[in-house]
Amino acid sequence: MTFLDTGILVGAVLKSHPEHVVCRAALEDSPRPFTNAHALAETFATLTGFYKVPTEAAAELTLSLRDAIAVEALALADYETAIREARSRGVMGGGMYDSLHATFARRTQAVQIVTRNPSHFQHVAPDIEILTP
């Protein structure tokens, strides 16, 4: 199973993204790709914030991901574990969200995380293979 990070999801759905082709390929070619519902919220936030995609289009793009990959909700235990791991690893600020994704990937037995930001995951997921498209 392969966990896809938010950056891959954004690049995969946004045709004007400079890495659209490789992100789309990562989504289509990964063995059993999946993500969590929080990554969908981050995708919508990134599309409407950084890329200024209108909310209606951003919602359609984000929700269309459910047809392409498996999406699972995070459990309270995922948040609790991620916070404990963030504390033990010295993770602060927005790195908490990468810790949350890594915790989820670990719980769901992902063998890989595909991301456009490998340095974000090397610290929070040293036990999982980190790939870039």
Residue ranges and their predicted role:
Residues M1, A102-P133:
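Acidic, PIN/NYN-like endoribonuclease modules and their adjacent C-terminal/linker elements
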Residues M1-T35, F50-E60:
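Short, well-structured N-terminal submotif of metal-dependent ribonuclease cores
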Residues D5, T35-N36, G94-G95, N117, ...:
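Histidine- and aromatic-rich ligand-binding microenvironments
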Residues L9-V10, L40, F121:
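A generic structural signal for short hydrophobic patches within well-formed alpha-helices
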Residues V53-A58, R66-A68, E72:
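Helix-adjacent hinge/juxtasegments
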Residues L63-S64, L74, R89, G93, ...:
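Internal alpha/beta domain cores that form substrate/cofactor-binding pockets in large enzymes
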Residues A70-R116:
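Active-site neighborhoods of divalent-metal-dependent phosphate/nucleic-acid chemistry enzymes
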